[in-house]
């Protein structure tokens, strides 16, 4: 839901940046890979070591490149099928790494198995949300929307992790359990959207 409004509000700032990067010979695929590698390294290195605030700051910077690579693609005229698949694949890798890093932190640093369950629920449900949309589109039906998409997922997760890194009690607990619940609702919403789309196509 927030993806549409967030991208629209920042497009006027990143579009000129996209033009300059194209002029410098930097393509969207390069930015996508850099953003993914940076996110994965920060999530699987800083979070497991207990550096929640530092990890959150670094991850936020690299996640923002997801907006920039789209601007670069538009500045070049259009995206490519390869770029679309690469971007979607890298998004899934980055999302998985963030929740894997937080799961490790919950187990090893915080010694909180219950919170680790919440992190794992977030990891699995995030992948399922994306898979439903991809599989639906491959089948010629729609599965857009839902309460939580990628933008909301990162805002909730990084806010909770960052505040916990600053010493705010239970911030990550609230964030992960809330996100897990919202993502389960989103899975249901997308499945219902697929069903409605199929019905609409079947009705003469």
Describe each model-derived feature in a short phrase.
Residues 1-63, 97-204:
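Hydrophobic alpha-helical transmembrane segments
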Residues 59-111:
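Hydrophobic, well-structured mid-protein blocks that either form specific transmembrane helices
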């Amino acid at each position: 839901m927030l993806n549409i409004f967030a991208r629209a509000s920042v497009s006027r700032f990143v579009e000129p940046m996209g033009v300059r990067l194209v002029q410098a010979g930097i393509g969207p695929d390069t930015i996508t890979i850099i953003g993914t590698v940076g996110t994965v390294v920060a999530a699987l290195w800083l979070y497991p070591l207990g550096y929640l605030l530092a990890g959150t700051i670094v991850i936020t910077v690299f996640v923002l490149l997801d907006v920039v690579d789209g601007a670069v693609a538009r500045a070049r005229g259009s995206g490519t099928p390869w770029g679309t698949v690469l971007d979607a694949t890298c998004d899934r890798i980055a999302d998985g790494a963030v929740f894997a890093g937080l799961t490790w932190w919950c187990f090893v640093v915080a010694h909180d198995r219950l919170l680790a369950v919440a992190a794992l629920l977030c990891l699995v449900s995030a992948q399922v949300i994306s898979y439903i949309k991809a599989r639906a589109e491959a089948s010629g039906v729609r599965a857009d929307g839902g309460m939580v998409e990628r933008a909301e997922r990162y805002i909730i997760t990084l806010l909770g992790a960052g505040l916990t890194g600053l010493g705010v009690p239970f911030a990550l607990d609230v964030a992960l359990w809330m996100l897990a619940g919202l993502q389960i609702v989103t899975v249901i919403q997308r499945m219902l959207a697929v069903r409605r789309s199929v019905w609409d196509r079947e009705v003469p």
